[in-house]
């Protein structure tokens, strides 16, 4: 942060704003709200409120392309999870199979039961380790048997903590009930399309 702040006076319009490291602070609409005070309306895009959100990797790749003509051909990928022998960050050519990258991290300490593109909260499950690293792959995770299986669901006690933790104040218990009932009209009334699937309510 200190290094970035040295550039504030040198680049017109640049302002460095440190934010608390609280999940899901990196969510696009969450960032916009905390930086500008604006809420992106339901069904709208950041551009509709005058914002463009780019992560650091994208900005760095754009700068490299402008300066050298070299397109994005590799990514820095975090390799982690309970089944990974030696977690770490690795520069990986796009298109490399996940199996090769896991091998570079020492292989598996136990047979993986779940593989993910992305983080543990919003990652996407993949069927096998032969899936390629993509240009938007920031992390790959491998979990053993203990972490791979969700605990049994328990009955809601209506404590309201899920609503308090939702960055958009959605009523997740009502959304879940409407989903189970197949009530599309209720889901629309509950603004289910605003949900970013961050998992905070769970």
List PLM regions with ranges.
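Generic beta-strand/beta-sheet core signal
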Residues: 19, 80-82, 93, 116-118, ...
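Hydrophobic alpha-helical positions that pack around
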Residues: 1-98, 104-109
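Ferredoxin-type iron-sulfur electron-transfer modules in oxidoreductases and energy-metabolism complexes
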Residues: 137-153, 163, 167-202
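Short glycine/threonine-rich loop-to-helix capping motif typified by GTGT followed
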Residues: 2-10, 125-132, 202
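Flexible, glycine/charged-enriched surface loops at secondary-structure junctions
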Residues: 16, 74-76, 109-118, 185-190, ...
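Glycine-rich phosphate/pyrophosphate-binding loops
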Residues: 1, 111-113, 173
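Active-site gating/interface segments in enzymes
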Residues: 24-26, 30-36, 106-160
């Amino acid at each position: 942060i200190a290094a970035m702040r040295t550039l504030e006076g040198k680049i017109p319009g640049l302002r460095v704003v440190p934010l608390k490291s609280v999940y899901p602070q990196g969510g696009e609409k969450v960032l916009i709200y905390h930086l500008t005070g604006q809420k992106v309306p339901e069904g709208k895009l950041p551009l509709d409120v005058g914002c463009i959100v780019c992560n650091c990797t994208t900005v760095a790749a754009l700068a490299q392309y402008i300066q050298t003509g070299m397109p994005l051909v590799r990514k820095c990928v975090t390799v982690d999870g309970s089944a990974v022998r030696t977690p770490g960050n690795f520069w990986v050519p796009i298109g490399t199979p996940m199996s090769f990258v896991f091998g570079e991290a020492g292989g598996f300490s136990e047979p993986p039961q779940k593989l993910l593109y992305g983080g543990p909260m919003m990652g996407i499950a993949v069927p096998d380790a032969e899936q390629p690293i993509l240009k938007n792959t920031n992390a790959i995770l491998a979990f053993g048997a203990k972490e791979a299986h969700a605990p049994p669901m328990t009955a809601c006690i209506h404590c309201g903590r899920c609503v308090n933790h939702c960055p958009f104040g959605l009523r997740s218990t009502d959304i879940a009930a409407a989903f189970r009932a197949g009530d599309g009209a209720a889901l629309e009334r509950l603004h289910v399309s605003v949900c970013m699937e961050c998992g905070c309510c769970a």
